[in-house]
Structures are given as structure tokens and as C-alpha cells.
Amino acid sequence: MGEKSRRKGPAPRHADGKLGRTCDHPYAPWSFTPSSRAPTAWVRPPCPVWASRLQEHSPEPRRARAPPTRRAQAALYAPALRLRDHLDRFSILMTSCTSWLQAPQAPGLCRDEQSSRISVPQLSGAPILLPDLEGTKLSNFQESSPLPHKHERKDKRSTPEEEGRSAPEKIIQSLKLCPGGHRPASLSSGCPAGCRLSFNLPPSMLLSVQKCCMPSSLKTC
């Protein structure tokens, strides 16, 4: 069977039946060759650079960086120039947007350009309510104004002349026909549907209609 060994596992054997031991230590693993018994061809000589560094025990001093070339400077400063160009373009766009906001949105509706301008407080999202409109139910608006995706028309008696009119003219005409024009349209029962529809208009047109609803300007509107 062979000699017993303190090493784990079966003992490797050569073809001639002898144990293949490379180290005489009893606890050394099989095929373990210490550096003292290894051939000289297996041992690589240490790198002279690393050997000198290990002997010195001091890091190599860093070299001073050379100034960047013109191409590197252009690459560094190019994004800043591009950002400045974009900022100029954004300022032009903002100027055009503010000028558009100050332009009259519905001139000729009540024959007053100043009343149809959009001001900054109106763009803040605050609700714009007509006088005596607080406390009214939302169903008053939902009954008279169908959803945008419903194309059915409730009033089938409209003539081609009424279809050709613009929305502000229809609203003003309904305001003239509304009994008791000084009262809010949603509170009057005999008021046509177009009068209640006026509260779903944009803020600029809503203010124009509000001015038209006043008894003093109802005659000239």
C-alpha cells in the first residue's frame, strides 16, 4: 500500500512505484517545491526599477505640468461660449414671449384693447370669479357645456348665420337676450345656455365678457 503520510489524500506514485516527494517536510502539500529546491530557470530576477524603488522607500517626485496647448484651451473654453450663445437666444425668446403676453388678445370684443390684455396676476392661477358667483354649483356649468370629445349639438335650431358667427359674438348676443342682464347669468333661470357658457372662456375673454355684462356697457357692446 505504501507509506502512511500525515498529508491528506492518496500519495502520488511514479511509474516505478516510488513516492513522488519534492519536499521532505511532513506537512508540506504534495507537489510542493520550495524556492531553495527550485531550478534557477524558474526563478525570475526582480525588476531593477522596482528593486531600486523598494530600496529607496521614497516616492518619485512629480513633474511640473506643462501649460495647456491652444487646442486644449479651446476645448476648455468652448462649452462656456456655447452656453453664452444659448443664453442670448433664451433672452430673445423670453422677450418675445413677454411681448406676446402684453399684446391685445381679443381687440374689438368690447371695443377696448386695454380691457382685453392679460396681466401678471391673472396668470398666477388664482380663480377669476364674476360678481355674486361664489356659492354657485358646478353643475350649472356642466349641464350647459358638454365635454370637448362629445361632438353632438344640443341646439339643433341654429341657423347657418349663427354657425358663421364667432364665439364672442354669440356670447354677446346671448347676453343681450338674457333677461336681467345686470345679474349673473348662472343665477337667472330664463337665461340661454350661451350665457352660462361664457364662464368657461379663457381669462382674457372672460374679463371682456364681464365688462360687457355691466348695464352701462351693455348698450355699446
UniProtKB/Swiss-Prot annotation:
Biased composition (Basic and acidic residues): 13-23, 155-168
Domain of life (superkingdom): Eukaryota
Biased composition (Basic residues): 1-11
Disordered: region residues: 1-23, 139-169
InterPro entries in UniProt: DUF5545
One Pfam match: DUF5545
Protein's UniProt name: Putative uncharacterized protein LINC02693
Lineage, top ranks: Eukaryota, Metazoa, Chordata, Craniata, Vertebrata
Gene name of this polypeptide: LINC02693
